Amino acid sequence: MRKIIVLILLLVVAGKAFSQPRDYNRDYRKHFFWGIAFAGTYAKMKMELDPVFWQRTDSIQSIRPQGQAGGGFGGSVAYRFGKYWELKTLTMLQLHQRNIQYAWQHTPGPNIKIETISFDIPLTLKYRSDMPNNTRMYVLGGVRWSHDFQSNQGLVIGESKPLVALKANTYYYEVGAGMEFRLDFVDLSLELKMSNGLNNALIRVPNSYYSGSMASIYPRLFSISLMAQN
């Protein structure tokens, strides 16, 4: 959070130092925009239990997904068409983690960590308002492909091994909203976004206590991003 605040202050100070008047017609003269982004994330999952879980006669009692914070950085490219619309991609390298807590009848079970280092390419459609007083709002929606470099999809997982693997490639739909602030040389934007998985990402080992007790996992990701765009 401190790094984000410092970045905002540096951009503001740099703009004032050059004392160049703002280009109010920049949006209407340009069609292509590029920028950089830093994001804070909260990774969760939607989990469904397999019917075999309810038929178990062993000591396993419950399985609970847990969310964890993460982050990422990347670059954006946008194409403006019409007065209010943009087609945008925000390529990101993201690091986050999801946990699964197992509870046994007499003792706490293992807390399994699913760590992710992903390369994400979204394609979103953005609708923005006018920009009175150098500020405007926007909404967006689209789809995203995510490739996980940490995936254990190709690993042979034994039935008793405390490991839950997710597929290397997952797909999301996402919606969000944000606010843009015009400075002398760049537009700063603060964006909130929610991404929900479309495909079942679980690699299920049928006789496993761990992944075999679940039918599906759909990853979810909530993010807040700070972007600077030319």
Predicted features and spans:
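Outer-membrane beta-barrel channels and translocator barrels
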Residues: 29, 82, 130-134, 182-186, ...
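Short glycine/proline- and aromatic-enriched beta-strand/turn motifs that initiate or cap beta-hairpins
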Residues: 19-70, 229
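Extracellular loop and loop/strand-boundary signature of outer-membrane beta-barrel proteins
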Residues: 22-23, 58-63, 106-112, 159-165, ...
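Predominantly the C-terminal beta-signal and adjacent terminal strand-loop region
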Residues: 165-175, 179-230
